[in-house]
Swiss-Prot record:
GO biological process: organic phosphonate catabolic process
Protein name in UniProt: 2-aminoethylphosphonate--pyruvate transaminase
Species of provenance: Bacillus anthracis
Cofactor(s) in the UniProt record: pyridoxal 5'-phosphate
Lineage: Bacteria, Bacillati, Bacillota, Bacilli, Bacillales
InterPro entries linked to this entry: Aminotrans_V_dom (IPR000192), NH2EtPonate_pyrv_transaminase (IPR012703), PyrdxlP-dep_Trfase (IPR015424), PyrdxlP-dep_Trfase_major (IPR015421), PyrdxlP-dep_Trfase_small (IPR015422), SP_NH2Trfase/AEP_transaminase (IPR024169)
Length: 365
């Protein structure tokens, strides 16, 4: 077991480094110039991670979980006469649909099975038939299963038909290389406690400046007004409109520095990729099969199908927790699965220890 109480093999919150945790021992004032300067550095670093064309984009930090930032985008970006196309194959795509419905935004859905990627042919057919669609949203890595959706093709189609593109990159940004300018993404949403390896407390939106400027006065919420949040940060040197999670921001800044030290997004992707491949190979040796086809599988989290015979997930969970590991239950309805994450401060020796614990026979009868 590591210095942590448990090794979190989850898609976030995840296992953080000792140094990320240590910076949260200090208190910060939200009005302090040093703190607000740190906020500005965070915003700039996020844009530089996202694209080489930095002048075209800006970052908005938003208190709360990643879902708060997604809802801030949905509620602020789409005008009253707008219409949203959502590509969904899991819980997080469905959540965007639910947000749109709650906010009385006209919404149409392109839905595929949870283990199948977004169907580009169907998406284009919908765009051809429905001229009222103004925006298109897709989840990059759907952690319901661990599947990767074809955001390159979705965004290319979106721009081909003149739509504003929204990408939920909650569980991929910082762990998979993305150039939002090349992909023509107008709004990308992610969170502090995912591949950057910070802790929960805020999400962020990397926005195309010209599109963000169009959002002024459109928000359907005071606290989730994306434009107002950005304008305050922009004009008041990193100040948030309402109380910000100071400890979380400091931890995130430290996590960004550690990402750079590791070698950037490509190096982190390689570690996650190697973790995932090792996990699947080792689990296969003891009878566990992944749900998602290898060509659609992300390096973020892997869903495994329940093996035949006397298998109980809760027994597996309890025994692994006793050995110092925490994994995730399944989240789909048609197939019994459980999930194991590959991200965070997790390395190949951790994956080997995990599978060794499962293989001992104490969890599978």
């Amino acid at each position: 077991m590591t210095e942590n109480h448990y090794l979190l093999l989850t898609p976030g919150p995840l296992t953080t480094t000792k140094t990320v945790k240590e910076v949260m021992l200090y208190d910060w004032c939200t009005w302090d110039v040093e703190y607000n300067t740190m906020v500005q550095k965070v915003r700039a670093k996020l844009v530089s991670l996202a694209t080489k064309e930095e002048e075209k984009y800006t970052t908005v930090l938003m208190q709360g979980s990643g879902t708060f930032s997604v809802e801030a985008v949905i509620g602020s970006v789409i005008p009253k006469n707008g219409k949203l196309l959502v590509c969904t194959n899991g819980a997080y795509g469905k959540r965007i649909v639910q947000m749109a419905e709650m906010l009385h935004i006209d919404v149409v859905v392109s839905q595929t099975e949870e283990w199948e990627p977004t169907n580009i042919v169907e998406v284009e057919k919908i765009l051809q038939q429905d001229k009222e669609i103004t925006h298109i949203a897709v989840v990059h890595c759907e952690t319901t299963t661990g599947i990767i959706n074809p955001i390159v093709d979705v965004c290319k189609l979106g721009k081909q038909y003149g739509k504003v593109t929204l990408v939920d990159a909650m569980s991929s940004f910082g762990g998979i290389e993305i150039d939002i300018a090349e992909l023509q993404i107008d709004f990308l949403i992610s969170s502090a406690n995912k591949c950057i390896q910070g802790v929960p407390g805020f999400g962020f939106v990397i926005a195309q400046r010209d599109e963000l400027l169009k959002c002024k006065g459109q928000a359907r919420s005071l606290s989730l007004d994306l434009y107002d949040q950005w304008e305050t940060m922009e004009n008041q040197n990193g100040k948030w409109r309402f109380t910000s999670p100071t400890h979380v921001v400091h931890a995130f800044y430290q996590a960004l520095l550690e990402l750079e030290k590791e070698g950037g997004v490509r190096a982190r992707y390689n570690r996650y990729y190697n973790n995932q491949k090792l996990l699947v190979n080792r689990m296969g040796e003891i009878g566990f099969k992944p749900l998602v086809n290898e060509k659609y599988q992300s390096p973020i989290i892997t869903s495994f199908i329940y093996p035949e015979g006397n298998f109980e997930f809760q027994q597996l969970y309890n025994e692994l927790k006793r050995y110092g590991f925490v994994i995730y239950p399944g989240k789909i309805s048609k197939v019994d699965t459980f999930r194991i994450g590959n991200i965070g401060d997790v390395h190949e020796e951790d994956i080997n220890r995990l599978v060794d614990s499962i293989a001992k026979g104490v969890v599978i009868g």
